[in-house]
Amino acid sequence: MITEYKEVLGNSKFVYLWMSQLFSQLTINVTNFLFLLKLFSLTGSTIATSLLWISYALPVILVGPLAAATVDMFDRRSMLMLTNFLQALSIFLYALLKNPSIFLVYGLAMTYSFLNQFYVPAEAASLPSVVPKKNLPQANSIFFLTQQGSLAIGFAIAGLLNHFLGFSTSLFIGAGFLFLAFVSVSFLPRLKPLEELPKNFEEGLGDFFSRLVEGYRLIKSNRMVLSPLILLLGLQVCLAVIAVNVPKIVQDVLGLSANVGMAFIAFSAGLGAGTGAILLSKLIKVGWRKKRMIDNFLLSLGIFMLLFIFTSGGFLGPLNIFVSFLTIFFMGLSFIGVIIPAQTFLQEKIPGGFRGRVFGNYWFLATIITIFPVLFAGTIAELFGIKLMFMLIGAIVVLVSFFSRRWGQNYLEEGAFNGL
C-alpha cells in the first residue's frame, strides 16, 4: 500500500496538480472563515454571516452545471491557470482596499465561487490525464484527504492569522497561495480538448442533467440508497449551519474571542474526528454493523450537542473550558462515526455504473438543500439566540436516532429493491 502511494507521489505531473489543489483548498477555507470573522465583527449578525454562505452557493446553482459542461471544451491546464490567477488577483485587489463596504465581501465571495465552478471540474477532469488508471484510487484518496484536511486546517488557522497578522495581511497570504497554485499547474503539459466546441458543450450539459435524472431515479426507487444519502445530506446541512454561526457560538456559548475560539473548536473537533476514525476501524474488527455504528454515534452526537449548550452557562467555573473541550471532542468523534459508515454503506449499495451519477452531483444537491436551512438558522440565532438554534439541532439529531433505531431496519428491508 505504501509503495502504491509512493508511486503516485513520485509522479511529478500529479504533484503539480496536487500542489495546486492544496494551495487552492487552503485559501478558500482560510478566506471563508476570515470573511465570517470580518462580517461578524462589523455587524454582530448571524443573518449577515448566513448570507456569506448564500453568496458562495448561488454560483454553484446558477453556473455549476454550465461550468461542468465546459471542462472538456478548452485546454484544462489553461483553465486551471486562468482561474487560479483570477482568484489570486481578486483577493489581492480586495486586500488593498481601505475600509471597504461589507457588500464587497459578498461580491468577492460570489466572484471566487464563480471561478471555482470552473476550477474544480477542470481539476477533477485533469486527474485521469496525469495519473495512470491503476493509480487513480490512491490519487483520489490523496485528493479527498487534502480536501478534508484543508477544511480543518483552514478553520484552525484563520482566527490565528487574523489575530496575529490582521485581516488584510492574511488575505495577501491567501493571494500568494493562489499564485503558487497558478505556478504549479503551469508546469503541467497541455491538456487539449479532443472534440469541437459546440458538440462538447451540448453533450456536456446534456450529460450533466441526464446523470442527475438517472441518479434521482435510482435514489427514489431504492431505500438502501435513499436513506444514507438523506442522512449524509442532513449532516451536511447541520455542518453548514454550525459553520456560518461559529463566531456567534464562540462569543455567546464559549465566551472566548472569535480568533481564539475558532482555533479551540477546530483543535477539539479535529482531535475527536481523528480519534473517531481510529475507533471505527477497531469496532469493525470486533464485528459492529454499519447500522449499529450509525445509530449509536448519531445518538451520541445529539446528546453531546445538547450537553454543550446545557453546560455552557459558566456555572462550572474553571472547568467550563475543559467540559466544552470534551463535548466538542465527542461531537467530532460522533460526527465521523456517522459519516464514514453511512458513506461506506452508500458506496456499497449503489450499483457500480451509478456511483458517478450519485456522488458526482452530491455537492450540487447539498448546496441547493442547505440554502434555506442556513438562512432560517441564521434568523433563529439572531432573534432567539444561538443556544436555542443549537438545542433544536441536537434535539432533531436525537429524534432521528430514535426513529432509526425503532423503524430504520424494517424501512430499509421493505423497500430495498423497490422498482429495481
Predicted features by range, described:
Residues 2-58, 217, 221-269:
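Helix-loop boundary and gating motifs at the non-cytosolic
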Residues 10, 41-42, 72-73, 98, ...:
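Membrane-helix boundary and inter-helical linker elements of multi-pass secondary transporters
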Residues 11-12, 45, 101, 166, ...:
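Short loop-to-helix capping motifs
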Residues 15-32, 55-69, 75-88, 104-163, ...:
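Substrate-agnostic recognition of the 12-TM MFS/MFS-like secondary transporter fold
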Residues 36, 91-98, 158, 162, ...:
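Structural signal for membrane-spanning alpha-helices in multi-pass inner-membrane proteins
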Residues 52, 62-66, 73, 77-79, ...:
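C-terminal transmembrane bundle of multi-pass solute transporters/carriers
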Residues 102-107, 113, 138-198, 267, ...:
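Hydrophobic alpha-helical transmembrane segments
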Residues 187-214, 415-420:
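Flexible cytoplasmic inter-helical loops of multi-pass small-molecule transporters
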